[in-house]
Regions:
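Residues that define the transmembrane beta-barrel architecture of outer-membrane proteins
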Residues: 46-50, 91-95, 139-143
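C-terminal beta-signal and adjacent terminal beta-strands/loops
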Residues: 60, 70-79, 101-151
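Membrane-embedded beta-strands of outer-membrane beta-barrel proteins
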Residues: 52-54, 65, 97-99, 145-147
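Solvent-exposed, flexible loop/coil residues
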Residues: 16-18, 46, 91, 123-124, ...
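Gram-negative outer-membrane beta-barrel transporters
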Residues: 1-79
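Short, well-ordered coil↔helix boundary/capping segments
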Residues: 86-94, 104
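Extracellular loop and loop/strand-boundary signature of outer-membrane beta-barrel proteins
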Residues: 35-41, 82-87, 130-135
Length: 151
């Protein structure tokens, strides 16, 4: 069993006189870039990330199985322009299962593998101010079968 949890708190910090130069050479106040003012998170930074991996290895029979859960809290996907709010994305909870079995015969081996990804088939969602949908779609689940023969 392996797991990790990362909690962060991020913010954008700028001074009253901080500016940036746009592609036309104009000086623009940093304060005008953030509709939420100083109380805004870094773009792409989740406050909480968690991963759990439960694995099983049977060395005598050449079998491995792993169950994986990945969680990422909501985060700023894109900054709002002028008075528009930031686009906040809610990444889906991802649950995967991976199994492999290696069969030995004389000097050869056959490895069979099965991967089941995104078992919950949750949808990806991003919105402005929780009401204007920016992106919404299902990621879809996937199944992979693998065969590897060594001689």
């Amino acid at each position: 069993l392996k797991f990790n949890v990362t909690a962060t708190e991020s913010e954008v910090v700028y001074g009253a006189n901080d500016t940036y130069v746009n592609s036309q050479g104009a000086l623009i106040s940093a304060a005008s870039l953030f509709a939420n003012g100083r109380d805004t998170r870094l773009q792409g930074q989740s406050d909480l990330i968690g991963n759990i991996q439960f694995g099983w290895d049977d060395l005598q029979n050449g079998s491995q199985a792993t169950f994986i859960v990945n969680y990422v809290s909501d985060r700023v996907r894109a900054r709002g322009i002028d008075v528009l709010p930031d686009v906040i994305e809610e990444p889906p909870l991802l649950v995967d299962f991976v199994y492999s079995k290696e069969i030995y015969y004389d000097t050869s081996s056959l490895k069979l593998s099965l991967e089941l990804r995104n078992l919950l088939d949750e949808e990806y969602y991003a919105a402005m101010a929780s009401s204007v949908i920016y992106d919404q779609y299902k990621l879809g689940s996937s199944v992979s079968l693998g065969f590897k023969f060594s001689f």
